[in-house]
Amino acid sequence: MADPSSYRPAPGTIPESPGVYRFRDGTGRVIYVGKARNLRNRLNSYFADPVNLHQRTRQMVFTAESVDWISVATEVEALQQEFTEIKQYDPRFNVRYRDDKSYPYLAVTVSEEFPRLQVMRGAKRKGVRYFGPYSHAWAIRETLDLLLRVFPARTCSSGVFKRAGQVGRPCLLGYIDKCAAPCVGSVSAEEHRAIVEGFCDFMAGRTDLMVRRLEREMADASAELEFERAARLRDDLAALRRAMEKQTVVFGDGTDADVVAFADDPLEAAVQVFHVRDGRIRGQRGWVVEKTEELTIGDLVHHFCTQVYGGEQGEADVPRELLVPELPADVEALADWLSDHRGSRVTLRVPQRGDKRALLETVARNATDALARHKLKRAGDLTTRSKALDEIAETLGLQTAPLRIECYDISQIQGTDVVASMVVFEDGLPRKSEYRRFIIRGATDDLSAMSEVLRRRFARYLDARAETGEAGVESAGDPATPAGPASTGPGVPDEPRVGTLVDPTTGRPRKFAYPPQLVVVDGGAPQVAAAAQALAELGVDDVALCGLAKRLEEVWLPDDDFPAILPRTSEGLYLLQRVRDEAHRFAITFHRQRRSRRMTESALDRVPGLGEVRRKALLRHFGSLKRLSAASVEEITEVPGVGQRTAEAILAALGDSTQPDEPRT
């Protein structure tokens, strides 16, 4: 670890303006991004007494080897810059409110002629009205199933809608009166839109008018002795009331707010948020995050707002009001920033009494319970993972536990569509952003394919090491131009030496930049021998290697005549099996994709610059590929949009496709 005093900037070079600062590790990778009202005061606080900092902050300061900053004019600009850089660099020491998924919304495609009701995730689209977010997609489908009795709107995809119109029969929902069947003309576009507007009014909280109208119609039907219709209206009312029960009314004034509460200890914090729309609780979400420094509840509110409401995904739905337990120090700048994202004024406040205070206390109890459950589960997970890694290290004779494990697998069918996968586990958990897929072109069997993929992976790693100037390392490929000296200037911090392990534009590691402590191959002694030979040819002797054979689950080591046997109940074996199975899943999925693509493509797909429209025009004109291949250049150019050069390329591609297949190199 670096001594913080070795890279501490001179206080006089740090401006006293607002800005954003970045700590980087030895490779130039951004590991922490922070915002400050006064850059000089904030940065000096890290170096004044680093030993007594918060545990995670101390680890960050001693891991870093450089710090740089950007000064801006206002706090709002600093807030925006901080958010942008956290999204760009994904620093490991920043508080991160995320759970690797986007939350579902109930979406209404109001811009279509026949609007559709559906579950939708991800980025919001124009012409779509959203209700939510919900915690689970099944909650949306359950609500829809109840409301389609009363509002029989379309829920099918465009393909299903068109096919039903072509055959003249609606889908099952049309027969059971849960769809008005606009696909077959049972209702007009105007009538269907009226149904959808009624649904939107109900979801927006205007429920009393709908209930009173149905009650009145039911009474009228009963008075006119239309008992079947009255019974249907009675069932519709019951469905509406069940749907209303799922969305508890907490505020009678139609409040549009997110209620946020926290529970924390010195190392972690749990956050819970209830989404209240039109006075009703629409959804609930929660996270548990690591605290990277001594953070107040106000600081946690700041981080929550910038990360949860700043994104382009569906979760970035900024409410009119945020009810929080404590206001952050930059509350005015934060409110301005949120208002810019929403497009109208957003307020943050601490409720003091009444229903809003009671709901905030309820959310706080949920946060406390969530933190307790997380700590109990995390204690078990950490113990299990540590035990598994220690068992693997002991079995393989490693000095330290393998914190980064890479596993490779080959997938093919009789030498066709040969592909390989590389999956990465760090600290016993999958790191999917590091997964890689390989197309194997020069090998047709598993052993040669395994050799090729390992040579390609570690050649890239050796090239990166050589370019950073590590002693004793020669490039495995073409020599790269060495990095030039960093530029400096008065009042500007020295730029960190960003080696080629890190992309200087993104601050993230390049592909294959970091070596594993352990390589696992899917297979037994032959696969391990092939992998060991490939590593030896490259001169890689500091990476452990093993293979996990199927069926007996034996662990094979290079040059060993007999496998190592881990107990069937061993945590180490469970981890190796999980790594191996993940590599197999990743490889076979890629293989199926390529095989499916190959089986459905034609020779015309390989013609450069020939798009789908012109391909269809050619097939319509000639009727088949056989007739097209027999045509002359002049005949092909008769097709609109096809010139002589393109016609020659088409004939060349069709001529190649009639030749026997040759192995690709």
From Swiss-Prot:
Similarity comment: family membership: Belongs to the UvrC family.
A Pfam entry, by short name: HHH_5
Protein name as it appears in the record: UvrABC system protein C
Biological classification of the source: Bacteria, Bacillati, Actinomycetota, Actinomycetes, Micromonosporales
Function: The UvrABC repair system catalyzes the recognition and processing of DNA lesions. UvrC both incises the 5' and 3' sides of the lesion. The N-terminal half is responsible for the 3' incision and the C-terminal half is responsible for the 5' incision.
UniProt subcellular location: Cytoplasm
NCBIfam families: PRK00558.1-5 (NF001824), uvrC (TIGR00194)
Subunit structure: Interacts with UvrB in an incision complex.
GO molecular-function terms, A-Z: DNA binding; excinuclease ABC activity
Region: Disordered, residue numbers: 470-507
InterPro entries: GIY-YIG_endonuc, GIY-YIG_endonuc_sf, GIY-YIG_UvrC_Cho, Hlx-hairpin-Hlx_DNA-bd_motif, RuvA_2-like, UVR_dom, UVR_dom_sf, UvrABC_protein_C
GO terms under cellular component: cytoplasm; excinuclease repair complex
Keywords, ordered alphabetically: Cytoplasm, DNA damage, DNA excision, DNA repair, Excision nuclease, SOS response
Taxonomy, superkingdom: Bacteria
Residue intervals of the GIY-YIG domain: 16-95
Compositional bias segments (type: Low complexity): 475-491
Domain spans labelled UVR: 208-243
Native species: Salinispora tropica (strain ATCC BAA-916 / DSM 44818 / JCM 13857 / NBRC 105044 / CNB-440)
One GO BP annotation of this record: nucleotide-excision repair
